[in-house]
């Protein structure tokens, strides 16, 4: 499993290539990604976050072993080679247990790392940047690095125990703000300074030495930094290369290291390409993919209303709204304003809090009902043109079947195509 170290080697040799990481557990998003990678004969990096998947089940109800089984089964059903599939764990550390004392939180983090590594995840992002209940705020670089080194030692030992070799690839550091898009309205964003990036690296190098982990330094392939990209509910802060140029140049002095950029969702194709050229060569994408899924489903729901008598419709949008109002915990603290503003945010926000609700059984039933209603007879071309114009062009040229499922998957793949192009290199 050397796809990532090989990518870094090529990038360092001047290829201006990169890799994107699909950060989603939604079956249709994953199917879209696997099929896209298969068609383009590229490796595929799929990541689970410590919120989604942990030793207790996370919010998806899946342990790392469950998630791996789920992804591998899907890949196998689509004839995707297992050796081209890379699984990553994102923000692994005490993130889920910040309300506990540090000793307890880190004991849980040890077990989290063990469960990810034992399940066969090979790209491990060590993130101990968050303060626990009895910690100072913010933590010093040294404390963060010591905790990361402790987890790296656990990871190495677990990997040797289960697989007989230590072949993990690590990412260290964190971005600001918190994972998953900003809560507040943004207008400008501080880019990580070269000094801060150097301090993080040196603190980690020193902490790894103290743990006797010198030999793994070449397998620390990336540092997470903030290149100045973010999104909130209705705005995107676009990458401005000039603001990140000093940071970009700084990493050129490290022969086995590139940068990883989080929250790259909704950047323009030109910005994505420039990020990779500027050594932010691992691009994380998640909400933009489920946002595209949601767009396609809303479009199909509108088509359904044109074609199917009201009483036979799935009512997907209303079911979704009702469930989100019944169980507001995933959006309530994120969306503000009056009732109408919050209604719009629930449906259309870039932060896409609706992604937490797709697994709900009522919503899943409505989705299945929608697909059944539209699969019974061909969808009229003018309606595809009206509601899914990008897919219409491909349907007309004969490259896309106009079935509900294929329309959804292709709409998601339009986003993946932007990332693929950005990462291809020269």
From Swiss-Prot:
<dbReference type="GO" id="GO:0005975">
    <property type="term" value="P:carbohydrate metabolic process"/>
</dbReference>
<protein>
    <recommendedName>
        <fullName>D-tagatose-1,6-bisphosphate aldolase subunit KbaZ</fullName>
    </recommendedName>
</protein>
<comment type="subunit">
    <text>Forms a complex with KbaY.</text>
</comment>
<dbReference type="GO" id="GO:0005886">
    <property type="term" value="C:plasma membrane"/>
</dbReference>
<dbReference type="GO" id="GO:2001059">
    <property type="term" value="P:D-tagatose 6-phosphate catabolic process"/>
</dbReference>
<dbReference type="InterPro" id="IPR023435">
    <property type="entry name" value="TagBP_ald_KbaZ"/>
</dbReference>
<dbReference type="InterPro" id="IPR012062">
    <property type="entry name" value="GatZ/KbaZ-like"/>
</dbReference>
<dbReference type="GO" id="GO:0009401">
    <property type="term" value="P:phosphoenolpyruvate-dependent sugar phosphotransferase system"/>
</dbReference>
<comment type="function">
    <text>Component of the tagatose-1,6-bisphosphate aldolase KbaYZ that is required for full activity and stability of the Y subunit. Could have a chaperone-like function for the proper and stable folding of KbaY. When expressed alone, KbaZ does not show any aldolase activity.</text>
</comment>
<dbReference type="Pfam" id="PF08013">
    <property type="entry name" value="GatZ_KbaZ-like"/>
</dbReference>
<comment type="pathway">
    <text>Carbohydrate metabolism; D-tagatose 6-phosphate degradation; D-glyceraldehyde 3-phosphate and glycerone phosphate from D-tagatose 6-phosphate: step 2/2.</text>
</comment>
<dbReference type="InterPro" id="IPR050303">
    <property type="entry name" value="GatZ_KbaZ_carbometab"/>
</dbReference>
<dbReference type="InterPro" id="IPR013785">
    <property type="entry name" value="Aldolase_TIM"/>
</dbReference>
<comment type="similarity">
    <text>Belongs to the GatZ/KbaZ family. KbaZ subfamily.</text>
</comment>
């Amino acid at each position: 499993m050397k796809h990532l170290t090989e990518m870094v080697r090529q990038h360092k040799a001047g290829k201006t290539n990169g890799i994107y990481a699909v950060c989603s557990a939604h079956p249709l998003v994953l199917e879209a990604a696997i099929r896209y990678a298969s068609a383009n004969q590229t490796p595929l990096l799929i990541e689970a976050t410590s919120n989604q998947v942990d030793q207790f089940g996370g919010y998806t109800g899946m342990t790392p072993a469950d998630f791996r089984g789920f992804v591998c089964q899907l890949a196998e059903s689509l004839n995707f080679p297992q050796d081209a599939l890379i699984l990553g764990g994102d923000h692994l550390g005490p993130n889920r247990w910040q309300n506990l004392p540090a000793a307890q939180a880190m004991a849980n983090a040890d077990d989290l790392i063990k469960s990810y590594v034992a399940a066969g995840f090979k790209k491990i992002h060590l993130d101990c940047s968050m303060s626990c209940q009895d910690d100072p705020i913010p933590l010093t670089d040294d404390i963060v690095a010591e905790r990361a080194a402790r987890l790296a030692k656990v990871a190495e030992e677990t990997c040797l125990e289960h697989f007989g070799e230590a072949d993990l690839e690590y990412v260290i550091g964190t971005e600001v703000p918190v994972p998953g898009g900003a809560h507040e309205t943004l207008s400008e964003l501080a880019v990580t300074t070269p000094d801060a990036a150097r301090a993080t690296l040196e603190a980690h190098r020193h902490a790894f030495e103290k743990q006797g982990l010198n030999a793994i330094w070449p397998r620390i392939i990336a540092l997470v930094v903030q290149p100045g990209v973010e999104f909130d509910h209705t705005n995107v802060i676009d990458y401005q290369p000039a603001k990140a140029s000093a940071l970009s140049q700084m990493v050129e002095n490290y022969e086995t290291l590139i940068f990883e950029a989080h929250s790259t969702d909704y950047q323009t194709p030109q910005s994505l390409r420039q990020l990779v050229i500027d050594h932010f060569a691992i691009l994380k994408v998640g909400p933009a993919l489920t946002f595209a899924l949601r767009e396609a489903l809303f479009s199909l729901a509108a088509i359904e209303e044109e074609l199917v008598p009201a009483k036979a419709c799935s009512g997907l949008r209303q079911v979704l709204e009702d469930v989100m109002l019944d169980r507001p915990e995933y959006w309530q603290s994120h969306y503000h304003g009056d009732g109408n503003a919050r209604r719009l945010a629930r449906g259309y926000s870039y932060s896409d809090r609706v992604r937490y609700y797709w697994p709900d059984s009522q919503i899943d039933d409505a989705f299945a009902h929608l697909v059944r209603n539209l699969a019974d007879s061909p969808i009229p071309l003018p309606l595809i043109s009206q509601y899914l114009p990008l897919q219409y062009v491909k349907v007309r040229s004969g490259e896309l079947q106009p079935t509900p499922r294929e329309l959804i998957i292709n709409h998601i793949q339009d986003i993946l195509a932007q990332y693929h192009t950005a990462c291809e290199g020269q």
